Regions:
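A general alpha-helix detector
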Residues: 23-24, 94-97
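N-terminal intrinsically disordered, cationic/polar leader segments
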Residues: 14-67, 74-77, 116-149
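N-terminal amphipathic/basic-hydrophobic helices that include classical n-h-c signal peptides
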Residues: 1-15
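Glycine-rich phosphate/pyrophosphate-binding loops
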Residues: 104-121
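Short acidic alpha-helix initiation/capping motifs at coil-to-helix transition points
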Residues: 16-19, 89-93
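Solvent-exposed interaction patches of small proteins and small membrane subunits
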Residues: 58-64, 82-86, 108-113
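Amphipathic alpha-helical interface surfaces
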Residues: 36, 90-94, 106, 114, ...
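Conserved interaction-surface patches within small, structured recognition/assembly domains
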Residues: 75-89, 99-103
């Protein structure tokens, strides 16, 4: 399910990542609200669980309605890779969708993303306020990891 941003040796720009987000948002908008949630739940069912030893407070995303953990870093080629786990399907599916959009993308491009760049996904309006806060915290942590590793 992960679609890498790099094809061959082609460098991916920030605009290309934003286009991927827009395209995924357009695809999701074809689904009605309940069907979008069902899609997120289906994604979550295919996420491999993180080992217990990385489910620490340091890796937990604060502000979520449920427990969400994110680990990540830059690979040798300076592209980012993230893995998530959560104890609720909607949270897990949402986080997996977000990380799939940035996995394999250049570190500097991921570091330049903002919460507003993800608005075209159209997910925020499906989430409770607390889950929206968690989504913002997840995106900020993704960017922070890209800025530090």
């Amino acid at each position: 399910m992960v679609q890498l941003c790099l094809i061959g040796t082609k460098k991916v720009s920030l605009n290309m990542i934003k286009e991927r987000i827009q395209t995924k948002g357009d695809d999701l908008k074809m689904l009605q609200g309940h069907d979008r949630l069902a899609y997120l739940i289906d994604i979550a069912k295919h996420v491999e669980s993180l080992p217990q030893e990385v489910k620490t407070e340091t890796n937990r995303i604060r502000g979520c309605a449920s427990n969400l953990w994110l680990i990540g870093g830059a690979k040798e080629d300076n592209t980012m890779i993230y893995k998530i786990d959560a104890d609720a399907f909607i949270t897990k599916g949402t986080a997996k969708l977000i990380t799939d959009l940035v996995n394999g993308c250049p570190k500097d491009e991921v570091a330049a993303l903002t919460l507003e760049d993800f608005i075209p996904l159209g997910i925020r309006e499906l989430l409770t306020m607390q889950r929206q806060n968690g989504l913002g915290s997840l995106i900020q942590r993704i960017v922070d990891i890209a800025n530090t590793k």
